[in-house]
Amino acid sequence: MNLRGRPKCNFLHLGILPFAVFVLVFFGYLFLSFRSQNLGHPGAVTRNAYLQPRVLKPTRKDVLVLTPWLAPIIWEGTFNIDILNEQFRIRNTTIGLTVFAIKKYVVFLKLFLETAEQHFMVGHKVIYYVFTDRPADVPQVILGAGRQLVVLTVRNYTRWQDVSMHRMEMISHFSERRFLREVDYLVCADADMKFSDHVGVEILSTFFGTLHPGFYSSSREAFTYERRPQSQAYIPWDRGDFYYGGAFFGGSVLEVYHLTKACHEAMMEDKANGIEPVWHDESYLNKYLLYHKPTKVLSPEYLWDQQLLGWPSIMKKLRYVAVPKDHQAIRN
């Protein structure tokens, strides 16, 4: 076998190799530089001055600010909204807000939307998804730039309990068919409320729940969980972290889809067995959140009834509050 030509070939390879390494390093550097600029590291990083966080000076000493599973509990004073706003704007985030205005509840819609325009996700892209059986009664509200309203016509039910429980079915259905393509996060809210102070991107997380204003200081034995073992919403007396309100929850669209789908399926199983939980969809929500821990928990600042509970000093702000009403007149 003639080997005389091989050394020449090896010298050629040795000459090409350094050149190839140089090309890879050069273009790799260009790619990483371009990527860092676009991801805000370091080119787009915030230049706003803000107070340095101090390890030995907690933001709040009067309330719990972290769950045992390391999810933050959001209170006034625990976050810097300027930093958060910039981070979510870099991601070009769009937030969906669902609200059900079925039957007489459509009367609350104007105040709900007007106060949302003043306080909800100001400066960010928002799509309001209004579920209603009365599309002609949806009020005209002036919306800010980057914000839009979508009316989704759905059927009503004779009993208000059925209206409440079928909310999970509708959110699940539209999350799969539509919301996944249109928004990054979904916030699910009750119509008979109003925004009274800032509610912004500090609430956004993979999955969040809100502490019920009536039970935030109570022991688990006082929680009004569903206690019948026959129900899919059943929670034993010795279990439970918090009692969450059904009027304000959300997260990524995918996680909200998983939640609402699981709750709806549990409802259907209970219905087949003639069982209706004590607090309807809220009972299923609490069961789900017990075994699928939220990645963020909102304090009662984000769900309050001032008429019933006043304004305790622990609440620095009341952000999302109940509108005074005659429950019987509205529901019947």
From Swiss-Prot:
Cytoplasmic side: 1-13
Binding-site list for an alpha-L-fucosyl-(1->2)-beta-D-galactosyl derivative: 212, 224, 282, 305
SUPFAM superfamilies: Nucleotide-diphospho-sugar transferases
Residues carrying sugar: 92
Known pathway: Protein modification; protein glycosylation
Residues of the active site: 282 (nucleophile)
Record: residues binding Mn(2+): 190, 192
Cofactor note: Binds 1 Mn(2+) ion per subunit.
First-listed, main subcellular location of the protein, grouped into a coarse class: Golgi
Single Gene Ontology MF annotation: fucosylgalactoside 3-alpha-galactosyltransferase activity
CDD domains in the cross-refs: Glyco_transf_6
Family: Belongs to the glycosyltransferase 6 family.
Name of this protein: Histo-blood group ABO system transferase
